[in-house]
């Protein structure tokens, strides 16, 4: 049986699984879908065309599915889609997409979103991502799986944060962070490969060694960007255990629109 506090407001049309728990003074809009075993904290607002999967935990005073902070937005029925097993802590704001992009803001599974985080319209957040308290994502930001963003950091619109990368606290990021790379500062600069994170996630010593070699080519050997890309492609085809990881790095760089941090 759904446990809805008597002070909560669940508008007609909302689709709520019978195992959902909704706390005091929470508001759930008419176009919201909430999956099994999800809990909605007190005073939080779930609105817009928002879909929450299973086993999510929404903290007190969170605002999920609000209107995009985009002056071009004209009340189009854009969406927010959140997967399973996400923790979204107090006072977080997550907005729906815009028709100027694909119209959907997405969060995957198993993400840890700490207090006061902002995830703007049309953002794409992968799986197992950590966004620390007060991290601020502008519109259209893409965050790869297992990435970490430190507290009090700001990320410019359309920036991409690669898988397994890490952005240090109180940083300002205006260009893409390649996968596996640590960055920090205002403006953010590269500070090596995220070796400890890769070890924890089961990357082999050979793969980590290959990524370290790739980092040296990209940042330490005095090569031009185009020269570095040529040698990175050669490294990705070396026939070693790290080829797949280096190929991921190369493909990310090739797809960059804003350029990577240098």
Swiss-Prot record:
GO cellular component: cytoplasm; membrane
Biological process terms in GO annotation: lipid A biosynthetic process
Reactions it catalyzes: a (3R)-hydroxyacyl-[ACP] + UDP-N-acetyl-alpha-D-glucosamine = a UDP-3-O-[(3R)-3-hydroxyacyl]-N-acetyl-alpha-D-glucosamine + holo-[ACP]
Places the protein is found: Cytoplasm
Enzyme Commission number(s) of this protein: 2.3.1.129
Role: Involved in the biosynthesis of lipid A, a phosphorylated glycolipid that anchors the lipopolysaccharide to the outer membrane of the cell.
Family: Belongs to the transferase hexapeptide repeat family. LpxA subfamily.
Subunit composition and interactions: Homotrimer.
Name used for this protein in its record: Acyl-[acyl-carrier-protein]--UDP-N-acetylglucosamine O-acyltransferase
Lineage: Bacteria, Pseudomonadati, Pseudomonadota, Betaproteobacteria, Burkholderiales
Name of the gene encoding the protein in the UniProt record: lpxA
């Amino acid at each position: 049986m759904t446990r809805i506090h008597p002070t909560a407001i669940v508008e007609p049309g909302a689709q709520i699984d019978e195992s959902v728990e909704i706390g005091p003074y929470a508001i759930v809009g008419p176009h919201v879908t909430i999956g099994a075993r999800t809990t909605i904290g007190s005073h939080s607002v779930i609105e817009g065309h928002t879909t929450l999967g299973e086993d999510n935990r929404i903290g007190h005073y969170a605002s999920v599915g609000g209107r995009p902070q985009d002056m071009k937005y004209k009340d189009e029925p854009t969406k927010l889609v959140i997967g399973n097993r996400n923790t979204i802590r107090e006072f977080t704001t997550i907005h729906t997409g815009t028709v100027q992009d694909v119209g959907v803001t997405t969060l995957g599974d198993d993400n840890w979103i700490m207090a006061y985080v902002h995830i703007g319209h049309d953002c794409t957040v992968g799986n197992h991502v950590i966004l620390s308290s007060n991290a601020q994502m502008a519109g259209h930001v893409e965050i790869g799986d297992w990435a970490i963003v430190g507290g009090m950091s700001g990320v410019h619109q359309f920036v991409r944060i690669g898988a397994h990368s890490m952005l240090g606290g109180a940083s300002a990021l205006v260009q893409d962070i390649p996968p596996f790379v640590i960055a920090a500062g205002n403006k953010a600069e590269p500070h090596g490969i995220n070796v400890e994170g890769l070890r924890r996630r089961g990357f082999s010593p050979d793969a980590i060694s290959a990524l370290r070699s790739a980092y040296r080519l990209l940042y330490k050997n005095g090569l031009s960007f185009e020269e570095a890309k040529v040698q990175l492609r050669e490294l990705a085809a070396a026939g070693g255990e790290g080829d797949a990881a280096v190929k991921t790095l190369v493909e990310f760089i090739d797809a960059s629109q804003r350029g990577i941090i240098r």
